[in-house]
């Protein structure tokens, strides 16, 4: 039985981590569907914590084999606010912020925006490092990916 089970709905916890900002970063996610858990992770040499948070969400949605109802839990206010509050305005403003500056990480925001149209996504914020089992596992996966990349 999966640790995060809700019948016929994918539950995912995502997290990004960075050693230095910018620096070596990793992302991790755990997806659960009908009692089966799947762990995914990856790392990059020169990145930021926000890029890794976005990558975790992107890779989570890319891992889905067909259109799904999915709830994604993140501890990133950047991701949560971006997807729920800022994205529509960025798109309407030609991918510029309210201050008329280029949106940071535009490439990843555009990819995430495209992927969210293929699924029924609910975004939920969870406090990081507060003992939440899913968030702790995603954080562990992100940091393990960094360790594997650096050989430490």
Swiss-Prot record:
Residues that, per the record, bind Mg(2+) 2: 15, 139
Sequence ranges assigned to domain RNase H type-1 in this UniProt record: 6-147
Subcellular location: Cytoplasm
GO MF, any single term: magnesium ion binding
EC main group: hydrolase
Top-rank taxon: Bacteria
Gene3D superfamilies for this protein: Ribonuclease H-like superfamily/Ribonuclease H
Residues engaged in binding Mg(2+) 1: 15, 53, 75
Pfam families according to UniProt: RNase_H (PF00075)
Known EC number: 3.1.26.4
Catalytic activity: Endonucleolytic cleavage to 5'-phosphomonoester
Alphabetic keyword roster: Cytoplasm, Endonuclease, Hydrolase, Magnesium, Metal-binding, Nuclease
Entries under PROSITE patterns matching the protein: RNASE_H_1
Subunit structure: Monomer.
General function of this protein: Endonuclease that specifically degrades the RNA of RNA-DNA hybrids.
Protein name per UniProt: Ribonuclease H
Species whose genome carries this gene: Francisella philomiragia subsp. philomiragia (strain ATCC 25017 / CCUG 19701 / FSC 153 / O#319-036)
